């Protein structure tokens, strides 16, 4: 690594630590020529292959931005969005692959988003899964109702009734 001060082509690592979120390594280096110290941060590059075939670096900010649109008007905090972004990044990095498709990233978003807010989940899923009819929405809602734990499973004595949507007959 070149010294940023004197451009000497070598440096010595003085200290090495992982960052708080564990996604990168912070190294303290010292130049053998000018003896000045500097810090570098190393991360594994994670690339996303888009539908068009274009490859771009994974962006947690882009994930949060997309989810924020689905959460618009919902009681979801910025802190919750940041945690979701971190969970998604951890999930995609855990695959061990250096390249992912946008489909893989979308799948990684759906799980944490479903836990965060069901309405936002439906909004995101409608775009991600390309819903093009009311039947697609109804099928997703039926699937969510089937996954929802019953009142006994949650430990309360109450029963939760989720009414089916009323559909007007023409």
Swiss-Prot record:
InterPro entries: ATP-cone_dom (IPR005144), NrdR-like_N (IPR055173), RNR_NrdR-like (IPR003796). A zinc finger (unnamed) spans 3-34. One of its GO terms (biological process) is negative regulation of DNA-templated transcription. Residues 46-136 form the ATP-cone domain. Keywords: ATP-binding, DNA-binding, Metal-binding, Nucleotide-binding, Repressor, Transcription, Transcription regulation, Zinc, Zinc-finger. PROSITE patterns: ATP_CONE (PS51161). Residues 148-170 are annotated as: Disordered. Belongs to the NrdR family. This is Transcriptional repressor NrdR. Binds 1 zinc ion. The keyword Membrane does not apply. Negatively regulates transcription of bacterial ribonucleotide reductase nrd genes and operons by binding to NrdR-boxes. One of its GO terms (molecular function) is DNA binding. Its cofactor is Zn(2+). It comes from the Bacteria.
């Amino acid at each position: 690594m070149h010294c940023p001060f004197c451009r000497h082509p070598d440096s010595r690592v003085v200290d090495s630590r992982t960052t708080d979120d564990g996604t990168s390594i912070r190294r303290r280096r010292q130049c053998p020529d000018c003896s000045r110290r500097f810090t570098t941060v190393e991360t594994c590059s994670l690339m996303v292959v888009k539908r068009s075939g274009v490859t771009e670096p994974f962006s947690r900010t882009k994930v949060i931005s997309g989810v924020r649109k689905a959460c618009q008007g919902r009681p979801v905090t910025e802190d919750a969005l940041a945690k979701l972004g971190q969970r998604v990044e951890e999930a995609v990095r855990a695959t061990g692959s250096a390249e992912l498709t946008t489909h893989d990233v979308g799948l990684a978003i759906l799980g944490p988003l479903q836990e965060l807010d069901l309405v936002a989940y439906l909004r995101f899923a409608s775009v991600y899964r390309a819903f093009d009819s009311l039947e697609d929405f109804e099928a997703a809602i039926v699937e969510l109702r089937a996954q929802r734990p019953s009142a006994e499973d949650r430990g309360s004595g109450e029963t939760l009734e989720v009414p089916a949507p009323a559909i007007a007959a023409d």
